[in-house]
Amino acid sequence: MENKILVETSARHVHVTQETLEVLFGAGHQLECRKELSQPGQFASTDRVTVIGYNKKDPNGPRPQAALSILGPVRDHNQVEVSFTDARQLGLEAPVRESGDIKGSGKCTLKGPAGEVDLEEGVIVAKRHIHMTPEDAEAFGVENGQNVAVLVEGQGGRMTVFCDTVVRVSPKYKLAMHIDTDESNACCGSGTIYGQLVSLEGDCDCDCEGEGHDGEGCCCGHHHHHE
């Protein structure tokens, strides 16, 4: 696979502020690293927090909940990232957003051993994205904030194209694409898998003559690579 990009599955998790962390776990509490993540300086902490959703069938019944890992370091806002499947199971409203874009997003309750915090916003389904350094972006011919299509080859030869994947560029990043667990299941994303940027427009190898069966784009499986 040419110009391959490592594809990683990002399972549900929580980011918190230091203030929220101390409400949940007690004054002066600090996150401790359990496992370093692929992005420099990021880590899965030893702490887990209970995310409490809403019982939509019976508002007076027990509220669904799940324990999620807290990722570090602490941030300047609280954010809960789940898949659509998680959101349904927990009765949460979770719009697709880029990380940090939480205004008007879903609400929930966070519960720790020392206290609870009601979040009026912050629950999202993270938009699939690619972390790139400026050098990576130049090599791939893309810009920060650009939406691209990525062909991912999962296990068992399952080929899946993920459109509307946003490119995020920073010298602090390391090249990797992040998808959630729903997307990973769709492409049989177990183990180490890779993707490559493709174009959905251009010369087509089937009889739609490059206009797709809906009149737009390329519909065949032979997608055209960005040079």
Positions of PLM-derived features:
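Extreme N-terminal starter segment of soluble prokaryotic enzymes
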Residues: E2-K4
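Short beta-strand-centered segments at strand-helix junctions
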Residues: L6-N55, G61-P113, D118-L151, F162-G195
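A generic signature of intrinsically disordered, low-complexity regions enriched in glycine/proline
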Residues: P59, R168, S184, D207-E211, ...
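Short, charged beta-turn/beta-strand-edge "cap" motif at the junction between a beta-strand
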Residues: E116, G154-R158, L200-D203
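Short, basic/aromatic-enriched C-terminal tail that caps enzymatic domains
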Residues: Y194-S199, H222-H223
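Histidine-centered metal-binding segments
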Residues: D203-E227
